[in-house]
Curated annotation (Swiss-Prot):
Family: Belongs to the UPF0235 family.
InterPro entries attached to this UniProt entry: DUF167 (IPR003746), YggU-like_sf (IPR036591)
Record organism: Shewanella sediminis (strain HAW-EB3)
Name of the protein described by the UniProt record: UPF0235 protein Ssed_1229
Origin organism lineage: Bacteria, Pseudomonadati, Pseudomonadota, Gammaproteobacteria, Alteromonadales
NCBIfam families for this protein: DUF167 family protein, PRK05090.1
Length: 95
């Protein structure tokens, strides 16, 4: 399993999420996943909502174009980003 893969125009990200971090950032590769730190706590879906908001800004896509395929309730997630307009350098290096 790769941390990042392309499916036609879409990106598939396998993520490890670190909630309650000091700042939002893409940390780097963590095993076979991409580690992302977010400031939101893992309570009542706040971390998922914050993650989608952060990714929408990073990839310049509407929030509706980011889909959590697996891991709705855990730290290990599989995310699909539909037709990203921008790919951050750290992720582009993994493609």
């Amino acid at each position: 399993m790769l941390p990042v893969s392309k499916q036609q125009d879409d990106l598939l990200l396998n993520l490890y999420i670190q909630p309650k971090a000091s700042r939002d950032q893409i940390v780097g590769v963590h095993g076979e996943e991409l580690k992302i730190a977010i400031t939101a706590p893992p309570v009542d879906g706040k971390a998922n909502a914050h993650l989608i908001k952060y990714l929408s800004k990073a990839f310049k896509v509407p929030k509706g174009d980011i889909v959590i395929l697996k891991g709705q309730l855990g730290r290990h997630k599989q995310i699909k980003i539909l037709s990203p307009r921008l790919i951050p350098e750290i992720i582009n290096a993994l493609l």
